[in-house]
From Swiss-Prot:
This is Aspartyl/glutamyl-tRNA(Asn/Gln) amidotransferase subunit B. Its EC number is 6.3.5.-. Allows the formation of correctly charged Asn-tRNA(Asn) or Gln-tRNA(Gln) through the transamidation of misacylated Asp-tRNA(Asn) or Glu-tRNA(Gln) in organisms which lack either or both of asparaginyl-tRNA or glutaminyl-tRNA synthetases. The reaction takes place in the presence of glutamine and ATP through an activated phospho-Asp-tRNA(Asn) or phospho-Glu-tRNA(Gln). The gene is gatB. Heterotrimer of A, B and C subunits. SUPFAM superfamilies: GatB/YqeY motif, Glutamine synthetase/guanido kinase. The keyword Protein transport does not apply. The keyword Protein biosynthesis applies. It holds the Pfam family GatB_Yqey. NCBIfam families: gatB (TIGR00133), PRK05477.1-2 (NF004012), PRK05477.1-4 (NF004014). It comes from Coprothermobacter proteolyticus (strain ATCC 35245 / DSM 5265 / OCM 4 / BT). GO terms for biological process: translation. HAMAP family: GatB. Keywords: ATP-binding, Ligase, Nucleotide-binding, Protein biosynthesis.
Length: 474
């Protein structure tokens, strides 16, 4: 029996517009339920929708970034279904002619993931289930917050081309980064700004399997776990000769299982028909010009980071954090040594910012530039640079601090030379290492730290010691 994993994704992304899709209610404001609402987004009879121009511009920008065909004329439809979070009894979305078709996202692995369509639609209200688990099952009551009703969404639908849970998770992670680079969405999954549904099946000996849908996966981890569980469930069922029903599933993060929600619906169940209150969406040249203000590419950032750092995993981590990457890129263009930048921007500073509870855009970049200049000129040691980074994170001028504490002029020591001296002065320890006693490394490390008065980096020193001792043992 040969099994093949097959999956496609449907991703809903909240756009960073100031107002809702079809009314003037603000998308952001106090977290008081049902305060950012009006007759339009509450679905009152007789109200008429007015399309949000900025949402259209953002969709065009995404279409350009994902190499898609942008339809100059597209249409809105009504998607009919009954649910308490949908006050009109239908959702305004795009049906047979979406704003974007035939796009793709190139992953950092080089694989291009085809995207069938990208369309505009409105969000539903938020359901709050009053129970110990926060889920509908076992809830005493369900409350509705219509602040989310009418928030502009884009839905991104891929072809079923994912060959593993890891590949699907990678796509979502890099799409998330792309949206952030463009500036059209914060795409924070934990806040519901990016929500993922997956359609998954397992082919048996080349024969197409039953497709099931898993709804509302709200983290990269959940995508991996849900798809892995579902693949194993299908395989086990086929081995037992059982039939997989076509259904819609949830994902329980506590058990890592996928309990059924309902029988899966088809497009016929939703009775799509053209939205009579909105004319066809006709794109004009000025909309395309406006879309140019949203620019940025995760893949380009990743390739730059890989060139600077040289290690795929570290380059990817840097590129996924837009603000961190932009700081690194700014200093790299100014000619700072990339080894120095990698230590400061990807190792020291992230830990410090995490400790003080600040984001990358909250630290004075001129302070970081000053610290980099001092170390690149050899006027301070790495240890002093780290101390000054702490001060910069606390909004203290690092130059003034260094002058007041007489830290300038403390140059980095020649660590290789110190290690050579310690090894020459301790031949017995070297002989013990050659005979297999690796514990002497700690003793030798202590001798180096004593000679440098604690200014040497312990991790780097241990690594250099082990390299030298290994060579001496050959």
């Amino acid at each position: 029996m040969n099994f093949k994993f097959v999956a496609g994704l449907e991703i809903h992304v909240q756009l960073n517009t100031k107002t809702k899709m079809f009314c003037s209610c603000p998308t952001e404001g106090p977290d008081i339920p049902n305060t950012r609402v009006c007759p339009v987004c509450l679905g009152y009879p007789g109200t008429l929708p007015v399309l949000n121009r900025e949402a259209v511009v953002m969709a065009i920008a995404l279409g350009k970034a994902l190499h898609g065909h942008i339809n100059n004329i597209s249409r809105f439809h009504r998607k009919n279904y009954f649910y308490p979070d949908l006050p009109k009894g239908y959702q305004i979305t795009q049906g047979d002619v979406p704003i974007i078709e035939n796009a793709y996202l190139e992953l950092s692995t080089g694989k291009k993931i085809p995207i069938k369509r990208i369309h505009l639609e409105e969000d539903a209200a938020k359901s709050v289930h009053v129970s110990s688990t926060g889920r509908l099952s076992g809830a005493e009551e369900t409350l509705l917050d219509f602040n989310r009703s009418g928030i502009p969404l884009i839905e991104i639908v891929t072809d079923p081309v994912f060959e593993s849970p890891e590949e699907a998770a990678l796509f979502v992670e890099e799409l998330q980064a792309t949206l952030r680079y463009l500036g059209i969405s914060n795409a924070q999954m934990e806040l519901g700004q990016l929500r993922c549904d997956v359609n998954v099946s397992v082919e048996l000996d080349g024969k197409e399997g039953t497709r099931v849908e898993i709804k509302n996966l709200n983290s990269i981890r959940a995508i991996r776990q849900a798809l892995s569980y579902e693949y194993n469930r299908h395989v086990d069922a086929y081995k037992r000769g059982e039939i997989i029903p076509q259904e819609t599933l949830a994902f329980d993060e506590k058990t890592n299982q996928t309990p059924p929600m309902r029988t899966k619906q088809t497009s016929e169940d939703y009775r799509y028909f053209p939205e009579p209150d909105l004319p066809p969406l006709v794109l004009t040249s000025d909309l395309f010009e406006e879309a140019d203000k949203y620019s940025g590419s995760f893949l380009e950032a990743y390739k730059n980071a890989l060139q600077w750092i040289g290690k795929e995993s570290e380059a990817r981590t840097l590129a996924l954090n837009k603000d961190q990457y932009l700081m690194y890129a700014t200093f790299a263009k100014e000619g700072f040594d990339t080894k120095l930048l990698t230590r400061i921007i990807t190792i020291d500073l992230p830990n410090i910012l995490s400790e003080v509870g600040k984001g990358w855009n909250e630290i004075n970049q001129s302070y970081i530039s000053a610290i980099l200049n001092l170390q690149q000129r050899g006027e301070i040691t790495a240890a002093v640079a780290k101390d000054l980074l702490w001060q910069a994170a606390r909004d203290i001028d690092p130059i003034k601090y260094a002058q007041e504490h007489q830290l300038l002029g403390k140059k980095d020591l020649d660590l290789e030379q110190v290690i050579s001296e310690v090894l020459e002065q301790n031949p017995d320890a070297v002989e013990k290492y050659k005979k297999g006693n690796v514990n002497v490394v700690s003793f030798l490390l202590g001798q180096v730290m004593k000679k440098t008065k604690g200014t040497a980096d312990p991790g780097e020193t241990r690594k250099l010691l082990e390299e030298r001792l290994t060579k001496l043992s050959e």
